[in-house]
Amino acid sequence: MQQDYSIPTGKELRIAISGASGCGNTTVSSILAKQLGIPCINYTFRNLAQELGLPLEEVIAQAKTDFRFDRLVDERQIERASQSSCVLGSRLAIWMLKQADLKVYLYASAEVRVARIFQREGGTLDGIRNFTAMRDRDDTRRYKELYNIDNTDYAFADMHIDTEHYKPDLIVELIIDELLRRSLILPREAE
């Protein structure tokens, strides 16, 4: 597939995209990385659970008291993101990837997030609503205890995008427009 954009010669580009579960983080990060022709790094508790052969719920439950899981996920993400140009999509990307050229925070209401997770994973709406609320609380507490990060304070991000009102492709267009505005990427014909 021919890429429409390029990174200026001799430069690298690192984009950090964060948001709570159901905000479109993984989808937007994947589409953006594909359009830019750079790797997408989205290593999560879900990946770690698969790697360890454990159910996701068990990893999440153990992570409440054992910070080893967070550290493993975060170390692997930062290690991979430090190697080359990439899009890093994770809950803490905008806080952890200090060298990111662009930091984007995606958000949506709890009800929209729950509906998206329900559509993606199935289950019951009440079960997902309760699990998502618990996970949000636990994530906020753990990040504060582990890294002294308040994941409810994302004012420093370069872009804040309400994903309730935009489809993933349009969100990617908004991010690409900002990358072009900052001269972090160039239209292919400008090479």
Segment roles from a protein language model:
Residues I94-A100, T152-A155:
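Short loop/helix-cap segments at secondary-structure boundaries that form the rim of catalytic
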Residues R113-F118:
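Acidic donor-binding loop at a coil-to-helix junction in glycosyltransferase catalytic cores
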Residues L125-L174:
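Small-molecule kinase domains that catalyze NTP-dependent phosphoryl transfer to phosphate-bearing small molecules
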Residues Q2, Q77, S82, A100, ...:
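Active-site cofactor/cluster-binding pocket
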Residues M1-V59, R68, S82-Q83, Q99, ...:
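Glycine-rich phosphate-binding loop of ATP-dependent small-molecule kinases
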Residues Q35, A100-Y105, E111:
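Internal catalytic or translocation cores that form aromatic/hydrophobic pockets or channels
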Residues P39-L97, E111, G122-N130, R137:
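ATP-dependent small-molecule kinase phosphotransfer cores
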